[in-house]
């Protein structure tokens, strides 16, 4: 594979991971805005499942050397920070 093809694949992989992360972020934002039922088990389960799936996607992309480990960790840490905000908000209600 040429360097350009590898770079293109890496950029595409990162963009796909970012898109999946943005979907999870939207779920978090919706829950923060509409915190009508604090700690809804179903909602928590969906978020946990999506986060786990994304972490597996990121791990796979890192192992294929399509995404740098640091970039993958940044995606997850940003979402974990937002999840922590959601948890704090639900505890206040």
Swiss-Prot record:
Pfam families: DUF1507 (PF07408). InterPro entries: UPF0358 (IPR009983), UPF0358_sf (IPR036270). Belongs to the UPF0358 family. This is UPF0358 protein ABC2396. It comes from Shouchella clausii (strain KSM-K16).
């Amino acid at each position: 594979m040429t360097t350009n093809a590898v770079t293109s694949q890496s950029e595409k992989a990162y963009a796909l991971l970012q898109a999946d992360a943005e979907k999870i972020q939207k779920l978090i934002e919706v829950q923060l805005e509409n915190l009508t039922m604090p700690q809804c088990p179903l909602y928590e389960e969906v978020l946990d499942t999506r986060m786990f799936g994304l972490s597996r996607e990121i791990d796979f992309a890192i192992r294929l050397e399509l995404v740098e480990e640091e970039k993958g960790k940044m995606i997850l840490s940003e979402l974990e920070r937002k999840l922590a905000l959601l948890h704090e908000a639900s505890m206040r209600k």
